[in-house]
């Protein structure tokens, strides 16, 4: 028998992912600042581009979080 799909913790899980991603962005910025003289322009650009992708992911996760919260409200 298939295990029931329990999504009750999805909002909490998504919030944790968003928080971790924001922390990674901050750490990447701090690293780039602390090592700016040691990093090549290409490395600095790679860090910046990765943070831009992280920001896009966060935007998508925030939308997913809204959907999950609304779904839970409608199903309770």
Curated annotation (Swiss-Prot):
Subcellular compartments: Spore core
Record-annotated membrane-spanning stretches: none
InterPro entries registered for this protein in UniProt: SASP_thioredoxin-like
Entry keywords, A to Z: Sporulation
Region (Disordered), start-end ranges: 1-76
Major localisation: other
Pfam entry (one): Tlp
Composition-biased stretches (Basic and acidic residues): 1-15, 26-38, 46-76
GO biological processes: asexual sporulation; sporulation resulting in formation of a cellular spore
Entry's induction text: Expressed only in the forespore compartment of sporulating cells.
Highest taxon listed in the record's lineage: Bacteria
NCBIfam families: SASP_tlp
Similarity remark: Belongs to the Tlp family.
Record-given protein name: Small, acid-soluble spore protein Tlp
Species of origin: Shouchella clausii (strain KSM-K16)
């Amino acid at each position: 028998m298939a295990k029931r799909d329990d999504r009750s913790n999805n909002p909490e899980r998504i919030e944790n992912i968003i928080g971790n991603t924001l922390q990674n962005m901050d750490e990447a910025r701090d690293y780039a600042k602390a090592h700016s003289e040691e990093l090549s322009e290409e490395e600095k650009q790679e860090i910046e581009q990765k943070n831009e992708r992280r920001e896009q992911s966060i935007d998508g996760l925030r939308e997913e979080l809204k959907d999950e919260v609304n779904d839970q409200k409608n199903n309770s």
